């Protein structure tokens, strides 16, 4: 018979008492994410954050979050291959105000455009907007057959590719450097820059599927709450006798109106 302690008898019970299960969601709260006024749909979703406690403030944890949203959801559109990045810059009440932070195409759209028997032409350029944003803009285009062409391939010569790339850089630089960020985003939504490039390059070589396929924000100007509020259509529209609704329309307020007292803050 083996000599030793019987572990089952000497042990008082299971190691450690049963811990109380705490639902982590009880310490969190939801915030509404608002898109800038350039887009048709302003309410793009909700985000979760831990409640303010001691020195840890909820709004500080929200600032800097990046939300990637399909343009179809932002514009109530069927074109789904463009994605916009929106960065949280300010928190007002339960609303998170965002600003443009980048744009890209979906992977499947890029893959579907690349085919045999044609030349792919890419260009990128760093441009500064009038309000101080430094953007890196990437353009892409593909050659296509000329009218009544019998030949299967439509390869462009090296000199033609260089000329088209130069034209791309010129048009992108002109369109971005002469506008502020709001106007640039308004051009990116329908991709009017890509259409201008396609039209201008017809004399060099016919192109199709000319798109701005990516935009990166390299540098931003110093943060200004006033400019962000203007971007959201809430800067100069509020008056003493009127308030601005979520869609940007002025709503008359009754004289002597006071907001209801909140029970919990």
Swiss-Prot record:
Main localization of the protein described in the UniProt heading: cytoplasm
GO cellular component terms, A-Z: cytosolic small ribosomal subunit
A Pfam match: Ribosomal_S3Ae
Basic and acidic residues composition bias: residue spans: 247-256
Biological processes per GO annotation: translation
Listed InterPro entries: Ribosomal_eS1, Ribosomal_eS1_CS, Ribosomal_eS1_euk
GO molecular function, one term: structural constituent of ribosome
Superkingdom: Eukaryota
Localisation per UniProt entry: Cytoplasm
Disordered, as annotated region: 234-256
Entry keyword set: Cytoplasm, Ribonucleoprotein, Ribosomal protein
Ranges that cross the membrane: none
Family: Belongs to the eukaryotic ribosomal protein eS1 family.
Subunit structure: Component of the small ribosomal subunit. Mature ribosomes consist of a small (40S) and a large (60S) subunit. The 40S subunit contains about 33 different proteins and 1 molecule of RNA (18S). The 60S subunit contains about 49 different proteins and 3 molecules of RNA (28S, 5.8S and 5S).
Protein name stated in the entry: Small ribosomal subunit protein eS1
Source organism of the structure: Aplysia californica (California sea hare)
Gene this chain is encoded by: RPS3A
């Amino acid at each position: 018979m083996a000599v030793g302690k019987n572990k089952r008898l000497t042990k008082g019970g299971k190691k450690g008492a049963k811990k109380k299960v705490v639902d982590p969601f009880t310490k969190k709260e939801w915030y509404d994410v608002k898109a800038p006024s350039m887009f048709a749909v302003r309410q793009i979703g909700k985000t979760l954050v831990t409640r303010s406690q001691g020195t840890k403030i909820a709004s500080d944890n929200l600032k800097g979050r990046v939300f990637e949203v399909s343009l179809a959801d932002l514009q109530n559109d069927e074109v789904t291959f463009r994605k916009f990045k929106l960065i949280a810059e300010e928190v007002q009440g339960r609303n998170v105000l965002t600003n443009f932070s980048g744009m890209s195409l979906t992977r499947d759209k890029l893959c579907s455009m690349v085919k045999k028997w044609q030349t792919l032409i890419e260009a990128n350029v760093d441009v500064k907007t009038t309000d101080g944003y430094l953007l890196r803009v990437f353009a892409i285009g593909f050659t296509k057959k000329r009218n009544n062409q019998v030949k299967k391939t439509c390869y462009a010569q090296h000199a033609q590719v260089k000329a088209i790339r130069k034209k791309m850089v010129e048009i992108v630089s002109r369109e971005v450097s002469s506008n502020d960020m709001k106007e640039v985003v308004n051009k990116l939504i329908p991709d009017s820059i890509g259409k201008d490039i396609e039209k201008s390059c017809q004399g060099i070589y016919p192109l199709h599927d000319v798109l701005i396929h990516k935009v990166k924000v390299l540098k931003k100007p110093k943060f200004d709450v006033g400019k962000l509020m203007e971007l959201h259509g809430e800067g100069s529209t509020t008056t003493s006798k009127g308030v601005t609704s979520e869609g940007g329309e002025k709503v008359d307020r009754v004289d002597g109106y006071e907001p209801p007292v909140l029970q919990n803050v």
